[in-house]
Amino acid sequence: MAASYSVPSMIMEEERRFEAEVAEVQAWWNTERFRLTKRAYSARDVVALRGTMRQSYASNELAQKLWRTLKTHQANGTASRTFGALDPVQVTMMAKHLDTIYVSGWQCSSTHTSTNEPGPDLADYPYDTVPNKVEHLFFAQQYHDRKQREARMSMCREERARTPFIDYLKPIIADGDTGFGGATATVKLCKLFVERGAAGVHIEDQSSVTKKCGHMAGKVLVAVSEHINRLVAARLQFDVMGTETVLVARTDAVAATLIQTNVDTRDHQFILGASNPNLKGKGLATHLSEAMAAGKTGPELQAIEDNWLGMAELKTFSQCVTDAIKKMNLAEYEKQRKLNEWMNHSSYEKCLSHEQAREVAERLGLPNLFWDWDLPRTREGFYRFQGSVEAAIVRGWAFAEYCDLVWMETSSPDMVECTKFSQGVKTLRPELMLAYNLSPSFNWDASGMNDNQMMDFIPRIAKLGYCWQFITLAGFHADALIVDTFAKDFARRGMLAYVEKIQREERSNGVDTLAHQKWSGANYYDRVLRTVQGGITSTAAMGKGVTEEQFEEKWTRTGATNLGDGSVVIAKARM
């Protein structure tokens, strides 16, 4: 008879703690925060991936704050408006007026990579680049929050009542590009974002190998299912860390011209194929390979591709069927009946697979219709894709369950597009929050809008559900504009340019960098020194002799100032 086995108490306790944590995670998922969220894994999976030492993250408080902010805007039909911040100066100025902060991959790529090597937005910088910028700004936010508290607690109550409180801790939403590789790369990227201070992250559905700025050409999509895997990987990492980090799914389906694979049936209706039967057999990639082997290069290869594509009569399968029905030798009413039946079965909402669409075409009398999506594939193996708002809507439906907001990247500020996408995606996901890129890549003056329409654009699309709107590169452009105009003026007018265009403007607009020593926290560290040294220090940075006293209202200096050239002026304060 086998001896009975007694489970050690340590093992029992380990299991008890594990099961308690599983129940805790499940209860968390059952809260209102995750009512619309679908997960492809269980609470047991999450707890098994955690360590035994529980950790908390400051970014989670801001993630919860971000969620409340966005849900309030959604309920009110308004929008959180923000832009890409370059540095701590910008993030502290933005805190006075805006309720969220954006960190752009484009801005990081061009101005602040972790290797210090700048370049265009191709997501080829090290993947810690944007998390590092998030940390840079998040540390600044926390520092200025500490600095403000010290300053306010040094005031009497009456002075505090007169001094506006600034919430420096505005939630940061960061650019996660494509997730920087496979699922494990996305997991590690998201871990970095949480640790570095991001309250939200967006991830797009381009190929990580060929990723481009959303307003460049040559964009290649991944399959719907692959991007869902990225979103699942991101959410899993947030769950493992116990955070409510806001996840934004971006789609580039409007302007994309290529897609990596045809493996997902939801993509089938948007893939282009050759409809000219005279090209049956050898594909474009084979023609190009043979031409290269024969010594052809550059313009010659481009001419071969252009000529082949010109003959291919590229169409979606739906367009091919529609054209074939119109050419049938039938009475007009019968053609129209078949067209109506085809459109009823093949509308984009149905998301027919190619095989299903073929079956419908056969029932309509088109059993051997020539259409081939493999023939026009590129040398890299990509399929041709017909980008459209409809393609973005289909992807929005698919992504919505796995994210918190959906962002459709567009090529212009088009109210018709915004309305079409919002109405389309909300037919299946009515509670979905939307994001919109108020891109500086658009020539807004060429958009057809007048000034009033531009001013009303944000509130108008906010009513459609776009509750987070952002200018990706406004920090970059604002920085360039002020430095270029000031440098030009300074070269011409010297110190008058600085005083007139910067110092006086800072004073008249109440910009706190006018007193830059105070802004940088010299008073804060004077208090640190006094605290360390028993309440007194002879080396205080803001003590007697600091030039910043010249910016106080009570300060004035009269008398002669020697200019060094034998002349003197009577100095006076401009207060």
From Swiss-Prot:
Pfam family, one: ICL
Catalyzed reaction equations: D-threo-isocitrate = glyoxylate + succinate
GO CC annotation: glyoxysome
Cofactors required: Mg(2+)
EC number: 4.1.3.1
SUPFAM superfamilies: Phosphoenolpyruvate/pyruvate domain
GO MF entries: isocitrate lyase activity; metal ion binding
Pathway where it operates: Carbohydrate metabolism; glyoxylate cycle; (S)-malate from isocitrate: step 1/2
Family the entry assigns: Belongs to the isocitrate lyase/PEP mutase superfamily. Isocitrate lyase family.
Protein's recorded name: Isocitrate lyase
Naturally occurring in which organism (per UniProt): Solanum lycopersicum (Tomato)
Higher taxonomy: Eukaryota, Viridiplantae, Streptophyta, Embryophyta, Tracheophyta
